């Protein structure tokens, strides 16, 4: 269900209705490339820090938490491929050591972004709340100086993700970066896994399926060593 209007705004009541509608009509995966700023995002960079704890988030956005809890606990079916719902959120792009909410909520899955070399993207939020990471691009790491056809120095962006964009008010495709691009990779893997499980007549409790995803994910910690060179000039 689309909950945002053309101005990237959403009313909380519409969001809650859409989430409940999804659960009641057979959806078992929420793909959510949105969220608030991390509680530890830097105000000096123009960010307004968001909630820092589950309690603070639930008090500030009680209807949102109620809707997500409804989906997590009521989506799916005891007689279907999965009992419960997967609420998958982008971790945020403030380069903060904590995911933003709702991604940081213990009932949701938080997705951080990695570059093509499996190291964290320069913008991605990270921390103990993150459950998965996936390709989200990193133009700062892959930006290569060059010249255009007129001999002007330009930056040629590489390593970004082909994504949906809004161009002049219309839906289009283009290259972008962010945890919003990483998150759909995990949602897609979850959907593929559930599709195969259905063919095999398997049934999972939601936590069983989450555990299976984590057990079969690729380890990336071994890539986190040495130095990472950036080519982008601020």
Question: Regions from the language model: what does each represent?
Answer:
Residues 68-83, 137-145, 197-202:
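Alpha-helix termini
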Residues 19-20, 72, 88, 112, ...:
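Non-transmembrane alpha-helical segments in soluble domains
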Residues 1, 20, 24-27, 33, ...:
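Bimodal feature
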Residues 8-12, 119-121, 140-143, 221-223:
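Short, solvent-exposed loop/turn elements at domain surfaces
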Residues 4, 35, 93-95, 115-117, ...:
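Acidic glycine-/aspartate-rich tracts in secreted/extracellular proteins
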Residues 1-105, 117-119, 168-185:
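Substrate-binding/access-modulating region of protease and related hydrolase catalytic domains
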Residues 100-195:
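Extracellular S/T/G-rich loop segment that most often corresponds to the catalytic His/Ser-adjacent loop
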Residues 20, 27-34, 42, 83-85, ...:
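C-terminal subdomain of the subtilisin-like protease fold in secreted/lumenal serine endopeptidases
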């Amino acid at each position: 269900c689309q909950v945002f209007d053309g101005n990237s705004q959403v009313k909380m009541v519409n969001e809650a209705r859409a989430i409940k509608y999804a659960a009641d009509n057979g959806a078992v995966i929420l793909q959510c490339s949105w969220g608030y700023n991390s509680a530890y995002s830097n105000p000096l960079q123009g960010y307004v820090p968001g909630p820092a704890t589950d309690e603070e988030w639930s008090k500030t956005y009680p209807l949102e938490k109620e809707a997500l809890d409804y989906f997590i606990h009521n989506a799916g079916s005891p007689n279907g491929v999965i009992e419960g719902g997967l609420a998958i959120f982008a971790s945020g792009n403030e380069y903060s050591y904590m995911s933003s909410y709702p991604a940081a909520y213990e009932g949701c899955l938080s997705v951080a972004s990695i570059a093509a070399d499996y190291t964290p993207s320069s913008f991605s939020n990270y921390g103990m709340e993150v459950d998965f990471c996936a390709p989200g691009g990193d133009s700062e790491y892959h930006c290569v100086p060059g010249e255009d056809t007129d001999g002007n120095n330009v930056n040629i962006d590489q390593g970004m993700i082909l994504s949906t964009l809004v161009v002049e008010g219309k839906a289009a495709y283009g290259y972008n970066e962010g945890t919003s691009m990483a998150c759909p990779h995990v949602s897609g893997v979850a959907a593929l896994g559930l599709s195969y499980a259905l063919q095999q007549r398997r049934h999972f409790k939601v936590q069983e399926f989450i555990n299976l995803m984590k057990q079969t994910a690729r380890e990336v910690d071994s890539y986190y060593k040495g130095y990472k060179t950036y080519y982008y000039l601020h």
